[in-house]
């Protein structure tokens, strides 16, 4: 997004940027919030889902929907000087809830607005996610399935941790307790500031 896009819906700005970069790419924007009611319909039919969401309720909703639809999920997250990327596919390995069964308690994780984000970090993590998605689509390379890449941009360290499938996972485990989509309570709500005129 650019400064000129401030105030515009992100979906419109993103679609415009993608079309400008490659006019041969078909862009199908959906100007709607992802909800428990529409997630399965919006995500069904795609080959890979890439999650770049900035809140826990949507992150868990996307995970649960991809598990229910049998789709691979390329996860990415950033906060401060840190970022992470992983591939979750419950058909072949763990899902996001295998790593984090439930959202963190309210107030335990600062929001991006509170902690900030190093400006280049979303681009780095997004590029890593794109590489993972390409590996999944072409069936090549070694996707980060069952592995989470952790980037410490401040210290210039990249490390990897294993993520195992959890037999007790509430959505992809042996006896799942989550069998329908629900929207988790938002644990990281930041009050909106009044608009400056």
How should these model regions be labeled?
Residues 1-197:
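Adenine nucleotide-associated cytosolic modules
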């Amino acid at each position: 997004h650019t400064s000129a896009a401030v105030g515009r819906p992100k979906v419109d700005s993103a679609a415009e940027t993608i079309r400008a970069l490659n006019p041969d790419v078909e862009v199908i924007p959906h100007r709607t919030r992802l909800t428990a009611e529409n997630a399965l319909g919006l995500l069904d039919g795609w080959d890979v889902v890439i999650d770049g969401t900035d809140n826990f309720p949507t992150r868990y909703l996307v995970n649960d929907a991809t598990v229910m639809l049998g789709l691979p999920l390329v996860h990415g997250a950033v906060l401060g000087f840190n970022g992470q990327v992983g591939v979750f596919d419950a058909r072949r390995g763990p899902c996001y809830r295998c790593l984090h069964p439930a959202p963190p308690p309210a107030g335990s994780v600062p929001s991006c607005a509170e902690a900030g984000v190093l400006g280049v970090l979303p681009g780095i993590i997004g590029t890593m996610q794109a590489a993972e998605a390409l590996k999944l689509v072409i069936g090549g390379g070694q996707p980060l399935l069952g592995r989470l890449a952790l980037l410490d941009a401040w210290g210039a360290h990249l490390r990897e941790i294993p993520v195992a499938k959890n037999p007790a996972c509430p959505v992809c485990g042996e006896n799942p307790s989550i069998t329908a989509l629900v929207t988790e309570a938002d644990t990281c709500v930041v009050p909106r500031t009044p608009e400056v005129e």
